Amino acid sequence: MQNYLVINTFVENSNENIRKFSKLAKLCRCSVIDCNFKVIGQSLSIILLFSGTWDAIAKMEDMLEKLEKEDDIVIQSKRTEIGKLQENCIPYAIDIVGPDQENLTFNIINFLLDGDLFIKRVSSSVSESSQTGIKMFTLHMIAHIPSNSSISTIRNEFTEFCDQFNLDAIMEPMK
């Protein structure tokens, strides 16, 4: 039987820290099921989902404790289960680009949740356009739409919503 452990930490951005956390699975004989490394400012955010036998996961937990003490960092970890597939949903990729505005991420997420979509992943950023210097907002999202929903209605309402904020958006089923 497989066991699962999710970890989350925020450390100094360095190749050594990336190597250290990447090496954990090998040392404990676990598999990496999901992996997210992201540089935020001068820091590195790490989220990993490991799977393994009960003794491999126990070894991982011990190594994480040791790593916390040696490197004086905080690592959140929790045993978890893999969620069941949402068979009654259609996965969609959503990409949005436009001028940055206050509360934009919240407004987009709130709109989609109000439409009964299930948000599975969100990544957004703001950067200065090299062409004009304006701050541009980008968002990538994976959402699941219940299969009994009217896709055309959701798409039309989403397009109207994005038009209100002068955002360019693409919403398409994942293959």
What are these regions (language model features)?
Residues M1-K175:
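Regulatory modules associated with amino-acid/nitrogen control
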